[in-house]
Amino acid sequence: MFGKGGMGNMMKQAQQMQERMQKLQEEIANMEVTGESGAGLVKVTITGSHSVRRVDIDESLMEDDKEMLEDLIAAAFNDAARRVEETQKEKMAGVTGGMQLPPGMKMPF
């Protein structure tokens, strides 16, 4: 069914892929991504595990209303989270050889 040494090779490849995935998961968790809103007036920097590292608010917004500022912060965080997801997909595609995951399955495992 697998040919000579086929099963052994397949197991070895699976182990190598698992090791690469583990290393990549650590790399992603430690990366930082910045999202912006209000044409860069609000910036939120988060890690690959979605922990907020920094929130930068332009001085000009301190005089505006509180609700608008809250909306801009939320939008900047959402932009950063979207960028993390995109980066994860790109990096994981390199490890999985572009193989698509089944629907509903998220990385890292």
Curated annotation (Swiss-Prot):
InterPro entries: YbaB-like_sf (IPR036894), YbaB/EbfC (IPR004401). SUPFAM superfamilies: YbaB-like. Residues 9-18 have a biased composition (Low complexity). It comes from the Bacteria. Residues 1-22, 88-109 are annotated as: Disordered. GO terms for molecular function: DNA binding. It is found in: Cytoplasm, Nucleoid. Keywords: Cytoplasm, DNA-binding. Homodimer. Binds to DNA and alters its conformation. May be involved in regulation of gene expression, nucleoid organization and DNA protection. Belongs to the YbaB/EbfC family. This is Nucleoid-associated protein VS_0917.
